[in-house]
Amino acid sequence: MATLSLVLAQLGASAWAGLADALPRVKASIVIVGTYKVSDSPRFQLRGTGFVIDEGLTVVTNAHVLSEVTGLSDAPALVVQVRGSDGQWQMRRVERHYRDDAHDLALLRIEGLAVPALVVGDSERVREGDDLAFTGFPIGGILGYSPVTHRATVSSITPAALPSPSARQLQERAVRGLRNGTFDIFQLDATAYPGNSGGPLFDPNSGEVLGVINMVLIKGTRESALSQPSGIAYAIPARFIRELLERHR
């Protein structure tokens, strides 16, 4: 029994053996997605996590991170904060954005110099039982804006059931799902928090993006997500990033 436990421990360790080497590359591409308005207090408000891909000026995040911040004349500006070579966060204006609400994804085109980009990998090769990792800002800026990394195991690849704010919308979504077809989503055995939304789910050895964290199962109230995390999170497969990117090149 002791020998079996040792073997299992070694197998688990080897799955994340390259994480320490991959992390510097991953963290260089992690950004903060939020809003900025002079009359707001605080002026900058974090909405979620994002990460840079492609040519270094395209950010991936969740569509729900943008909800309620776009389309209104008096809405705060949608901005992204990137970490400069001096380690300080720099605010970048979002020049335009594209949404895929069906898959809860969004692409943001930002101004300025290119940021180190992550490679979008092949999410079709992800299997149940795979050990992955994700990085983001789980509890916002409470402890400062420092990206945090968690390990995750793919516990299930299951049909998506994205949350809706009302029963009526749930019914409409179900109808659209039947019309447009359903898609699979990664269920993760991992502790994530609302601030992780939009962060990359990646291969811990190569750093390639295999999914986007999009929701956390919350037991009870939203506040209980911090005090009593469910240990269950979900991620959108990366193939939908590729499809959205191709539509808006």
Model-derived features: where do they sit?
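Bacterial N-terminal signal peptides
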Residues: A2-Q10
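Short, well-ordered loop/turn sites that connect or cap secondary structure elements
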Residues: I53-D54, V126-R127, P204
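Active-site substrate-binding loop(s) of clan PA
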Residues: D21-A22, V69, E95-H97, E111-S146
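Active-site region of chymotrypsin-like
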Residues: V26-R43, R109-V119, V148-E246
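N-terminal signal peptide c-region/cleavage motif recognized by signal peptidases
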Residues: G12-S14
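Catalytic-histidine neighborhood of serine endopeptidases
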Residues: D54-D100
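A conserved glycine-rich beta-strand in the N-terminal activation segment of trypsin-fold
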Residues: A17-L19, Y36-T58, N62, Q90-R93, ...
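Beta-strand/loop subdomains of soluble extracytoplasmic proteins
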Residues: P76-V79, S85-V94, E128-A133, P147-Q171
